[in-house]
């Protein structure tokens, strides 16, 4: 599948929710139902076993071999790949952080790759994301 980086605030086809917001919500719902793999090792295993339904890769990964590996596995098995600009942002979205009293993320750990194996319940965010992936 073709991969491309999502620009901040890029409008979704339906116009109700942008793709980044939809992706954030879908990742949170997948985490709730234990359908989220985080980190290169877990993601590579899920991609190789073909249990992955969607792969999210940070664009600023410090090791180019990681990027090539994930892109190759996604292309080989026909899994959709979405790139986000920052690994810290992806780390916050997949729960690799502490939340303080005000609800702000603290001590965010960067995440190079995340894979969704189970989406969880059907939602508007999932529909927006699927429409976006179909149009690419």
From Swiss-Prot:
Gene3D superfamilies: 3.30.1330.30. GO terms for molecular function: structural constituent of ribosome. Signal peptide: none annotated. The keyword Ribosomal protein applies. It comes from the Eukaryota. Keywords: Ribonucleoprotein, Ribosomal protein. InterPro entries: Ribosomal_eL30-like_sf, Ribosomal_eL8/eL30/eS12/Gad45, Ribosomal_eS12, Ribosomal_eS12_CS. One of its GO terms (biological process) is translation. PROSITE patterns: RIBOSOMAL_S12E. Belongs to the eukaryotic ribosomal protein eS12 family. This is Small ribosomal subunit protein eS12. The gene is RPS12.
